[in-house]
Structures are given as C-alpha cells and as structure tokens.
Design a protein with these regions (language model features):
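Alpha-helix N-cap/helix-initiation motif
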Residues: 3-7
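N-terminal accessory/pre-domain segments preceding catalytic cores
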Residues: 1-2, 81-203
Length: 203
C-alpha cells in the first residue's frame, strides 16, 4: 500500500544518516489496528545516546505543523521514552530495546518543556510581541481538558494584550502546543486545531 513506503523510506533514510554520523540506530516496527482505523504497520527509529535508548519518529514529526502558512520542522517525536511514544503508536511487533528515559527529549533539552502556567503566559506575551510562532511541551501533570483550557485562556489573554488573536494547534497525545498570533479584526473566535500525527496511515 502507499502508506507503508512513506514511513519505511523515512526510517531507512534516518538510519543511513545516523549510521554515517556514527550514531547507533535501529528500525522499530509496530502493527496495524483496523479497529482504530490504522490500516498499515508503522516504522520509526530507536537511537542510542550516551548508552540510553530513545524513540525517534521523523514520519510523525513530518506530518505535523502543516496548518496555516507554517511549515516549520516539528520535534514532538524526537527522543521519546516508551511511555510517551505508545500514547499514539501501536505495540511493537518485533523485539526492540526498552526506552525508559526522556532526558534527551527535544523540547526538554531546548528548555521548551514547561511545568508552570506562568512560564507559558510569559512566553506567550513574548511571542505576541515579536510576531513569531512558538511551540512548547507541557509536563506539569496530565494535559487534562481543564489544564488545556487554562493554557488556551492564557495564550489568548497574552494575544489580547497586543490586540491579536491566537491561532493554536495541539498534538494532544504528546502534550505539545504550537501557536502564533494574527491581528485582531473584531470578535473573531480564537482558532484551535487538533493535529493528528501521521494521518497518511489511517483510513
């Protein structure tokens, strides 16, 4: 099928690149799940950094951030532990190393993984002022509906202070939010898009 070649080709390309750089890397494979509308198997990579294993799924990252005019690279699946990756990946069907730490998760390394709502608000104010796109990961407990509503309110409030409306996209399973602001032309409802990674492998 057409969906199979995409992730397999990307995972093999990542392995070739990492092999060339001397980074240990294998290909992971999980099953399909017709009940969930996942009609193909999926492949990605497991890498080893300083003796610790992490999941790296370039296919899922490549499928995100295509809303609006923005096509910036995403890192939601860059060095995840088992707990995080299997929130939206099916179980493995071939043996692979356990990935038990998240220390090198991209957003954590870049200090873009927040546990306090005030940090989100502070960065939202900066984003509204500078007119940029901002992506962050939430790790202040589970991203429940109540927590999400609080974060969305703060992001919108920061925009209102600069007479701007927020455009927000959400990768809920990985607790990653991305937003920017547009000029406020009257009472426009803030736009929230729920992104689903790797839509190409679903029915």
């Amino acid at each position: 099928g057409q969906g199979v070649g995409v992730c397999e080709g990307i995972a093999k390309a990542v392995k070739v690149l990492l092999d060339a750089l001397g980074v240990w890397c294998v290909i992971a494979i999980c099953g399909n799940n017709p009940e969930k509308g996942i009609k193909y198997r999926h492949t990605w990579n497991i890498v080893k950094i300083n003796g610790t294993y992490y999941h790296l799924d370039a296919t899922f990252d490549n499928s995100l951030g295509k809303d609006h005019e923005n096509t910036e690279i995403r890192y939601d699946y860059f060095n995840l532990d088992d707990k995080s990756i299997f929130r939206d990946h099916e179980p493995l069907i071939a043996p692979a190393p356990k990935c038990e730490e998240g220390d090198h998760f991209y957003y954590k390394e870049k200090k873009l993984s927040f546990t306090k709502t005030e940090d989100v608000y502070r960065r939202a104010l900066q984003t509204a002022k500078k007119g940029r796109v901002f992506t962050f990961h939430w790790r202040g407990g589970y991203l429940t509906k109540a927590v999400l509503e609080e974060l969305l309110e703060l992001i919108q409030k920061a925009g209102k202070e600069k007479q701007k409306n927020a455009r927000i996209s959400l990768n809920w399973s990985q607790a990653v939010l991305r937003f920017d602001y547009v000029e406020d032309h009257g009472e426009v409802e803030p736009e929230v898009v729920v992104e689903e990674a790797n839509e190409g492998e679903k029915e």
